[in-house]
Amino acid sequence: MSGPQHITILGATGSIGLSTLDVVARHPSRYQVFALTGFSRLDELLALCVRHTPQYAVVPDQFVARKLQDDLAAAVLDTRVLVGEGGLCEVAAHPRVDAVMAAIVGAAGLRPTLAAVEAGKKVLLANKEALVMSGDLFMQAVRQSGAVLLPIDSEHNAIFQCLPGDFARGLGAVGVRRIMLTASGGPFRETPLEQLQNVTPEQACAHPVWSMGRKISVDSATMMNKGLELIEACWLFDARPDQVEVVIHPQSVIHSLVDYVDGSVLAQLGNPDMRTPIANALAWPARVDSGVAPLDLFRIGQLDFQKPDEERFPCLRLARHAAEAGGSAPAMLNAANEVAVAAFLDGRIRYLEIAGIIEEVLNHEPVTAVEGLDAVFAADAKARLLAGQWLERNAR
């Protein structure tokens, strides 16, 4: 290796960004932070810049940029501050960047992630919404640019590790019968259905296994997160929706499985810590220490599996239907979910109304073909408008 890889971290102050920085800091001769971006936790972004001395930082607006630039100057740092989506795309596609951690949550991460792909970077994809929204357009860009796309979601990273290196020839060609996505079941896996009506945001964010941000914690509680991962798996591994099965596995030790036609089932196991898939993708095809403790099977004792209940988890059903419909449906599903989850976290709707909003949006609009990025964002905007109108009529 001639020198350290230069890394841009999109979404540096979130849980994935912080875990990435933890792994990077363990290997200073391998990795050097080139750019960090943040949206709301700007004091933390300043602290990260002081600690990791990136060449660039990106923030959402000019007011914040001026303050951060002054604070960096006071700390005797020459980090340059960029602004907005243009700044995100610049640090994602910069010629000096080798790898990009795409960890901005939601639709906001699509353009900068695509910028990294189109520049032919090694893209560590934690922003599942980018692929859910743009699907075939995203994968076409990967193929045309020669970018290396490595999944960071623990489930997709597990599948990637369990598939043969030439899986791009087609799952059937390499003997794969099905992919099994594991899910913890979230905090309400055994909650009586009649109690779900009164679930609070704090309860929904109290995940029993993983430490995550608030939006993805709610998605995990509703199992929309698993639904989005189902759609993501279809695009990453060229699978049909009926080739992807969701299995509830409360211990979150098996991160996913691949079932082969000869009866073999390969699984990837590990402690539930995002530093494992991050380290795997950063170093791929090599391996480096992630800082994660070794798995102790004797302490775990047993592994359990359950079939998801669609009455309890209607968002999983809606996501599978969107995957089967294709076209604009996944982008609309994602947008409606983002609006509904934000309203729930703000106390404007009840937990069970999240799925209701999404279903109403999907039923309102016919599925259309998505032939360009403008069509993706048009579907996204339409779904947000419809979800917003529902809130105007019904929110508390």
Curated annotation (Swiss-Prot):
NADPH binds at T13, G14, S15, I16, N127, E129, G213. One of its GO terms (biological process) is isopentenyl diphosphate biosynthetic process, methylerythritol 4-phosphate pathway involved in terpenoid biosynthetic process. Belongs to the DXR family. It holds the Pfam family DXP_reductoisom. The gene is dxr. GO terms for molecular function: 1-deoxy-D-xylulose-5-phosphate reductoisomerase activity; manganese ion binding; NADPH binding. Its cofactor is Mg(2+); Mn(2+). Catalyzes the NADPH-dependent rearrangement and reduction of 1-deoxy-D-xylulose-5-phosphate (DXP) to 2-C-methyl-D-erythritol 4-phosphate (MEP). Its EC number is 1.1.1.267. This is 1-deoxy-D-xylulose 5-phosphate reductoisomerase.
